[in-house]
């Protein structure tokens, strides 16, 4: 049986000590903020109570349209933009991958923003540098949800967007069970959103856990990327096979039944790691997603990855 990703033992111990009053969680807040600023190369950062609250803060600061990808994003983008009564523009993508040139076809108002995830559907790295360059040249603010891309050793993700935000809930790369953050070089973002920030303040327990998890972010992301790459190399028809990702998506007309069978044969001790599509958060075509990002790092050994590959082959998903 596979193990679902949870906060590390050290993280849980620190959070427990903060909860019991053995150590002061408030002492960790500034340390967390400094680590986030260093990871994102951004001058200001705030810790929040959830990833969705980070999105709420970011979108609250935008006066123009909110541009969202047609798939491969996060459903909270649209839900929160609607709640804030923002005009939403849907951007055509290549199965989740953003081609900045497609924005030439859109009628976009001033002071608008594009919000997207570091990995399209978790399976394919976005060209964040090209996206940021296009948007900067056209007066569009970029908001990157780097929940799955924070700590990129190649410095391509979670660095160059105007606003970087993330969830730190399970089973994210920074995993403390809940919480999130938002970072930017534009101080006006935070001046405009003082009320949402007050309403989404995280607990001291989160500060303690996050401070510990931030120390392992780069290593944890790299382990996940390497495991995903290993599986992709052994399968012939994965989506965006040449891109880095933290899951593996395999298109198939009978995705629903195959996905069900895989769930029976690839069980975890908690939530699963098989997702079926169509699914806005992945791709809007029939497919099965193997959520490597959901697995505990101890499960990312070759023996376990070979078991996943074997079950995929047996299921005729290839």
Model feature map: region roles:
Residues 173-236, 259-260, 266:
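Conserved core segment of the aminotransferase class I/II
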């Amino acid at each position: 049986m596979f193990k679902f990703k949870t906060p590390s033992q050290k993280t849980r111990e620190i959070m427990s000590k903060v909860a019991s009053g053995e150590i002061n969680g408030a002492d960790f807040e500034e340390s967390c903020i400094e680590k986030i600023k260093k990871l994102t190369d951004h001058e200001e950062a705030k810790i929040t109570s959830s990833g969705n609250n980070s999105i709420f803060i970011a979108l609250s600061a935008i006066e123009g349209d909110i541009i969202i990808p047609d798939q491969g994003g996060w459903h909270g983008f649209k839900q929160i933009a609607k709640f804030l009564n923002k005009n939403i523009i849907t951007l055509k993508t290549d199965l989740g991958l953003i081609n900045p040139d497609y924005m030439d076809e859109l009628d976009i108002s001033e002071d608008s923003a594009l919000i997207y995830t570091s990995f399209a559907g978790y399976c394919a790295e976005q060209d964040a540098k090209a996206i940021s360059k296009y948007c900067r040249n056209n007066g569009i603010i970029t908001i990157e949800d780097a929940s799955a891309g924070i700590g990129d050793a190649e410095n391509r993700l979670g660095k160059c967007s105007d606003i970087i935000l993330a969830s730190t809930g399970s089973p994210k790369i920074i995993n403390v069970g809940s919480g999130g953050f938002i970072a930017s070089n534009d101080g006006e973002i935070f001046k405009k959103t003082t009320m949402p920030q007050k309403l989404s303040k995280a607990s001291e327990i989160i500060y303690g856990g996050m401070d510990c998890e931030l120390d392992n972010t780069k290593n944890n992301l790299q382990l996940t990327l390497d495991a995903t790459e290993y599986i992709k190399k052994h399968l012939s028809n994965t989506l965006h096979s040449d891109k880095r990702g933290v899951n593996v998506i395999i298109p198939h007309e009978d995705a629903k039944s195959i996905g069900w069978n895989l769930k029976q044969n690839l069980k975890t001790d908690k939530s699963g790691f098989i997702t079926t599509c169509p699914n806005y958060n992945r791709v809007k075509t029939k497919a099965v997603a193997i959520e490597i990002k959901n697995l505990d790092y101890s499960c990312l050994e070759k023996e376990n990855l070979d078991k996943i590959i074997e079950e995929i082959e047996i299921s005729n998903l290839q």
